[in-house]
A protein has these predicted regions:
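Short beta-strand/loop motif that positions the catalytic acidic residue
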Residues: 163, 169-171, 175
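N-terminal cap/lid segment of alpha/beta-hydrolase-fold proteins
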Residues: 1-22
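The serine-hydrolase catalytic nucleophile loop
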Residues: 35-47, 181
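Catalytic histidine-centered segment of alpha/beta-hydrolase-like enzymes
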Residues: 204-215
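Alpha/beta-hydrolase active-site loop
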Residues: 74-91
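Conserved alpha/beta-hydrolase
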Residues: 50-69
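Hydrolase active-site cap/lid region
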Residues: 110-150
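Short alpha-helix in the alpha/beta-hydrolase fold that links the catalytic acid
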Residues: 44, 165, 179-189
């Protein structure tokens, strides 16, 4: 990948580590990684593909991840969105496309409305009840999201019902974390989207989907087309 411009963004007494790549196109992707051991490097392959086609991108390591470090339990869904906004402001970018993996998909979904993006890519999307939004990660957060089907009353359905851009939802057929019902319902909810597609990757689990997608010409094309490119 071309050398990205590193960013060190002050945020609530710490520094967020991020980077941005410029492109000639007016299109710009912002990637939000998931929880666990994930970090912004998960987007490297897609960002390289976009950069080769003139599209810039930005990604960050949220608090508790990657170079940013810190304690995951000191963050929350709400604070992750605040971190994304801080990086966007520092980089001076207003993305046309948001992409999120797992937990990051919920951040992308909620931010899509206020940023009025043209495209939304949700990969193995984690969806949450609004009750969990401000709760710090830890036992209380876990107790909320572990309630059976707690995601049913998520605000995600209404947000996508208002979304008018391009939507790509990607699921792993063998995902043991995110039930297939969630990506199916997200796709179905986007009744006003200008374009919507659901990809279910055969045999895939919850992690490692992006390299698989990029290695498959048809799935790779779906990613590019959602961002706004002709494959």
């Amino acid at each position: 990948m071309s050398s990205p411009v590193p960013l060190r963004v002050p945020f609530q007494g710490r520094e967020l580590h991020a980077d941005t790549l410029s492109g000639d196109s007016p299109l710009h992707l912002f990637g939000i990684h998931g929880g666990g051991a994930s970090n912004r490097s998960v987007w490297d392959g897609l960002r390289q593909s976009l950069w080769q086609r003139g599209v810039g991108s930005t990604a960050l390591d949220c608090v508790g991840h990657g170079q940013t470090g810190g304690v995951f339990a000191e963050s929350s869904l709400q604070r992750r969105s605040h971190q994304v906004r801080s990086v966007m402001a520092s980089a001076g970018v207003r993305p046309t496309a948001l992409a999120g993996i797992s937990m990051g998909a919920y951040n992308a979904l909620r931010l899509s409305e206020e940023l009025d993006v043209q495209a939304l890519i949700l990969i193995v999307p984690g969806i949450y009840t609004p009750e969990a939004h401000e709760v710090p990660f830890g036992p209380d957060f876990s107790a909320i999201i572990r309630r059976p089907r707690s995601w049913v009353d998520s605000d995600a359905w209404d947000i996508l019902g208002r979304f008018r851009g391009r939507l790509l939802v990607i699921a792993g057929e063998q995902d043991s974390v995110i039930p297939l019902e969630i990506p199916e319902r997200l796709h179905a909810a986007a009744t006003r989207a200008s374009r919507r597609e659901l990809l279910v990757v055969p045999g895939a689990g919850h992690s490692g989907l992006l390299p698989v997608l990029l290695d498959n010409p048809q799935w790779h094309a779906s990613l590019l087309e959602c961002v706004g490119l002709e494959a």
